[in-house]
């Protein structure tokens, strides 16, 4: 008996692609002083969360990473969270 042959199977599940939270008319501006916004994109271990999880576009992910690194350097965000 062959799997996939025949008709009555379920439709494959497709997850809808999330849109970038920083694109759009009322999107927040990426700023290194906005610790509350930046901390949403840092894991509990202190690492920058990848864009495939946060659905941030490549350009905005680079801006976000730069802002997080700048905030860490200035002491607004910790490098490591214990």
UniProtKB/Swiss-Prot annotation:
GO cellular component: cytosolic small ribosomal subunit
Protein name: Small ribosomal subunit protein bS18
Keyword entries, A-Z: Ribonucleoprotein, Ribosomal protein, RNA-binding, rRNA-binding
Matches recorded under Pfam families: Ribosomal_S18
Quaternary structure (record): Part of the 30S ribosomal subunit. Forms a tight heterodimer with protein bS6.
Role, per record: Binds as a heterodimer with protein bS6 to the central domain of the 16S rRNA, where it helps stabilize the platform of the 30S subunit.
One Gene Ontology biological process: translation
Positions in coiled-coil regions: none
One example GO MF annotation: small ribosomal subunit rRNA binding
């Amino acid at each position: 008996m062959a799997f996939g042959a025949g008709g009555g199977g379920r439709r494959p599940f497709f997850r809808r692609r999330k849109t970038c939270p920083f694109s759009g008319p009322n999107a927040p501006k990426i700023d290194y002083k906005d610790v509350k916004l930046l901390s949403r994109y840092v894991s509990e271990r202190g690492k920058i969360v990848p864009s495939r999880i946060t659905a941030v576009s490549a350009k905005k992910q680079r801006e976000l990473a730069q802002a997080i690194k700048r905030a860490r350097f200035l002491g607004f965000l910790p490098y490591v969270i214990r």
